[in-house]
Regions:
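Conserved beta-strand-loop-beta-strand hairpin that lines the nucleotide-binding pocket
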Residues: 1-12, 57-137
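STAS-typified acidic loop motif
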Residues: 12-24
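Preference for short coil/turn "hinge" residues that link or interrupt alpha-helices
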Residues: 15, 31, 54-55
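Conserved short strand/loop->alpha-helix "switch" segment adjacent to the catalytic nucleotide/phosphoryl-transfer site
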Residues: 23-50
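Histidine-centered phosphotransfer motif of kinases
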Residues: 44-62
Length: 137
């Protein structure tokens, strides 16, 4: 018996540097949940996809470039979200003023997901988060 989970499903899409891309990425995630028979944690996943896609658009996608969304589900029920961009810059969770309406995206991702992180690559970076317990119904 193999002790390592195997990939069960995967879906990838590229999105242009356009504010409408966040909604389209969220829609793809919603359709993917339905296609894969997932219901648990959908609201958390959708919010994290929105936050990571928004961060990519605001801070990581140079003009004329795209960002990439990867969704994957393994046999252990771990759903992984990855957003890749080609822009420079470090990812950090900022100190946010209580009255500020911005700067909470990565704090939300950290709070809602079971794990998250950043992997640097040339060019750009991959910001990812994982959700356990996402088995098909």
């Amino acid at each position: 018996m193999n002790a390592h989970p195997q990939l069960l499903h995967a879906r990838t899409a590229l999105y242009p540097r356009d504010r409408r891309s966040v909604a389209v990425a969220r829609d793809l995630t919603r359709v993917t949940f339905a296609d894969w028979g997932l219901t648990r944690r959908s609201d958390d996943v959708l919010l994290c996809v929105s936050e990571l896609a928004t961060n990519a658009l605001l801070h990581g996608v140079p003009p004329g470039r795209c960002f990439r969304l990867d969704l994957s589900l393994d046999t252990a029920g771990v759903l992984r979200v990855e957003v890749q961009d080609s822009g420079p810059g470090e990812i950090r969770t900022p100190d946010v003023m209580p009255e500020s309406e911005r700067g909470r995206g990565l704090l939300l991702v950290a709070a809602l997901s079971d794990d998250w992180g950043v992997r640097h690559r040339e060019p750009g970076k991959v910001v990812w988060c994982e959700f356990r317990g996402c088995r098909p119904s």
